[in-house]
């Protein structure tokens, strides 16, 4: 009888080829996380919550012409954090990756953000720091990465306690593998 078990690292990187990179800035108390692999891949999305902030997630619908993506970004910074995917796109374009339009390749990097603007970090910057955070996260992709207060989880909170970045994997036999990565920044009281 086949049974469920966690992957060797209990991480999304237990899924063949997937890599994750984190970058954060302790001064602004925010960061970005990138999920990618060496080749494009398929993805899907479910958008929930009262005020979701996303970019390029519409392309993940099965009726769209873009079948594969090149990366996914999770970032803090509310709407400012969506710029982290621009930094990742710069890196991918430098590797000649992306959706081939016939003229140029356009890296497809859906992203989602969390609200960490009231966590006590410095937010009076004049130049949006998230493009650079996205680039730095991409340059650090690996099959081994930090969870907790790293990357998109750096400034995440759950009301009065710390939120953060988490990951898991589950295998059903040798053929079915599921991985997840999440930046938890919920509202309400944990008590």
Regions found by a protein language model. Give the residues of each.
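Alpha/propeptide regions of enzymes that mature by internal proteolysis
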Residues: 1-191
């Amino acid at each position: 009888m086949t049974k469920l078990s966690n992957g060797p690292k209990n991480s999304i990187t237990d899924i063949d080829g997937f890599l994750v990179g984190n970058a954060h800035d302790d001064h602004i108390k925010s960061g970005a996380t990138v999920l990618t692999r060496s080749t494009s891949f398929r993805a899907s999305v479910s958008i929930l919550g009262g005020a979701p902030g996303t970019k390029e997630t519409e392309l993940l619908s099965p009726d769209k012409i873009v079948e594969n993506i090149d990366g996914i970004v999770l970032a803090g910074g509310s709407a400012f954090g969506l710029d982290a995917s621009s930094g990742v796109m710069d890196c991918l374009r430098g590797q000649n990756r992306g959706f081939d339009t016939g003229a140029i390749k356009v890296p497809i990097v859906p992203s989602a953000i969390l609200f960490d603007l009231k966590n006590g970090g410095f937010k009076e910057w004049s130049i949006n720091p998230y493009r650079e955070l996205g680039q730095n996260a991409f340059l650090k992709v690996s099959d081994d990465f930090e969870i907790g207060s790293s990357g998109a989880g750096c400034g995440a909170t759950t009301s009065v306690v710390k939120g953060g970045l988490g990951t898991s994997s589950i295998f059903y036999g040798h053929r079915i593998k599921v991985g997840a990565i999440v930046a938890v920044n919920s509202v309400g009281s944990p008590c």
